[in-house]
C-alpha cells in the first residue's frame, strides 16, 4: 500500500518554506521560519566575551538554546523552568553543533553568538526548521556586525540546512509533518552543508529495522530537500555574495 500524504505532497516534496527576516527589533539577527504549519522564531544575539576555555585564544564561539511555547502543540505542555528535559538539551546541542560548522571562529574574534530557537507552533520538524532558519538569522547578524564595523571580515565560511525524512509503507518521504512523523517506522534528521557534506545524521527505527538500501534512499531523499533549502536560504539573505566566504 502506498502512503497518501495528508497534504497531497509528492514523496520528495518539501512543505512550503518561508523566512521572514528582521522579524524582531533588538536582535542583530531575527527570522521567523515557517515550514508548512511549523513556525520557529530564530534570533541571534552577540556578546563581547567567550567561555573561559576560549579566553585569550582570539577565537569566538556559538551556542544555542531551544524552547517551545506551552501552546505550540494541541495540548498545552508545562514550561521548562528549573530543569530542561533531555529532549530540549539534545535539540539545542544539535542546533549549536550544526551552526558551528558555518563559522570561522578566528574571524569572529572573542565574541559569542547565541542562537535562540523558540517554537511558536509545532507540526514536526521543529529542530530542522530551527537549524535552517537559525542559519539565516546568523547571516543577518553577521551582516549587521560588518555594517557596524564590529567585524573586519565575514566569518561565514559555510552554509547549513537540515530536513527530516522517514519511511512510510517502506518508502522514503521528505519533510514529515506530525501525522507522518507519528506513523513513520523510521525517521531521520539530516544536516548538510553547501557541498552536501553530512554534518549530522540522527536516525532510528521506531519498530523493527531498516536496510542499508533504505538508509541510502533516506539520505538521497534528504539531499534532494536540502538542495532546495540551501537555495531558499540564499534568496532570503540579501547580501549573500558579500557575506559568504567559503567554497
Curated annotation (Swiss-Prot):
Any one biological process term the GO annotation gives: rRNA catabolic process
NCBIfam families listed in its UniProt record: RNasePH (TIGR01966)
Record EC number: 2.7.7.56
Amino-acid positions noted as binding phosphate in the UniProt annotation, renumbered to this chain: 87, 125-127
Protein's UniProt keywords contain Signal: no
Pfam families from the UniProt entry: RNase_PH, RNase_PH_C
Gene name of this polypeptide: rph
Gene source species: Trichormus variabilis (strain ATCC 29413 / PCC 7937)
Protein name: Ribonuclease PH
Quaternary structure and partners: Homohexameric ring arranged as a trimer of dimers.
Key words of the record: Nucleotidyltransferase, RNA-binding, rRNA processing, Transferase, tRNA processing, tRNA-binding
Amino acid at each position: 500500500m502506498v502512503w497518501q500524504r495528508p497534504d497531497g505532497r509528492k514523496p520528495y516534496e518539501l512543505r512550503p518554506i518561508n523566512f521572514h527576516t528582521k522579524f524582531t527589533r533588538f536582535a542583530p539577527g531575527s527570522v521567523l521560519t515557517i515550514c508548512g504549519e511549523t513556525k520557529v522564531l530564530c534570533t541571534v544575539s552577540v556578546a563581547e566575551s567567550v567561555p573561559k576555555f576560549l579566553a585569550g585564544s582570539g577565537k569566538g564561539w556559538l551556542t544555542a538554546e531551544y524552547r517551545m511555547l506551552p501552546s505550540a502543540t494541541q495540548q498545552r505542555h508545562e514550561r521548562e523552568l528549573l530543569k530542561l528535559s533531555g529532549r530540549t538539551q539534545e535539540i539545542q546541542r544539535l542546533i549549536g553543533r550544526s551552526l558551528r560548522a558555518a563559522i570561522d571562529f578566528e574571524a569572529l574574534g572573542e565574541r559569542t553568538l547565541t542562537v535562540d530557537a523558540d517554537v511558536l507552533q509545532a507540526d514536526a520538524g521543529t529542530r530542522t526548521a530551527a537549524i535552517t532558519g537559525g542559519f539565516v538569522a546568523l547571516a543577518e547578524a553577521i551582516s549587521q556586525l560588518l555594517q557596524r564595523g564590529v567585524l573586519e571580515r565575514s566569518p561565514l565560511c559555510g552554509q547549513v540546512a537540515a530536513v527530516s525524512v522517514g519511511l512510510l509503507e517502506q518508502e522514503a518521504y521528505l519533510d514529515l509533518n506530525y501525522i507522518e512523523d507519528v506513523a513513520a517506522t523510521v525517521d531521520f534528521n539530516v544536516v548538510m552543508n553547501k557541498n552536501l557534506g553530512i554534518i549530522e545524521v540522527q536516525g532510528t527505527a521506531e519498530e523493527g529495522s531498516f536496510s542499508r538500501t533504505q538508509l541510502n534512499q533516506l539520505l538521497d531523499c534528504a539531499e534532494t530537500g536540502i538542495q532546495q533549502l540551501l537555495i531558499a536560504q540564499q534568496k532570503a539573505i540579501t547580501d549573500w555574495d558579500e557575506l559568504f566566504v567559503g567554497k
